[in-house]
Amino acid sequence: MAKISCSSFFVLMLVFSVFSLVEKAKGDERCTIIIHPGSPCDPSDCVQYCYAEYNGVGKCIASKPGRSANCMCTYNC
């Protein structure tokens, strides 16, 4: 009887661990927002504003070659 209880315990722990990992993965979603879309991007301002407002990472990225860069902020949703 002890062998059945021990193996059942380990199976339940394995199932519980898998569900815990799945829930954690769902919570790690990342969002992206364009900050001040019409304004030219200053890299230092972009980084500081994104971190202060969203606790994220800001980068100046041009949507197409030849266009001015926009401040793209990536943060946890």
Curated annotation (Swiss-Prot):
Q: Name one GO biological process term.
A: defense response to fungus
Question: Which cysteines bridge via disulfide bonds?
Answer: 31-77, 41-60, 46-71, 50-73
Q: Which UniProt keywords apply?
A: Antimicrobial, Disulfide bond, Fungicide, Plant defense, Secreted, Signal
- Record's GO cellular component, any one? extracellular region
UniProt subcellular location: Secreted
Query: What's one Pfam family the UniProt record gives for this protein?
Result: SLR1-BP
The secretion signal range is: 1-27
Entry superkingdom: Eukaryota
Q: Name the family.
A: Belongs to the DEFL family.
What this protein is called in its record is: Putative defensin-like protein 157
Q: Print the organism lineage.
A: Eukaryota, Viridiplantae, Streptophyta, Embryophyta, Tracheophyta
**Gene that encodes the chain:** LCR22
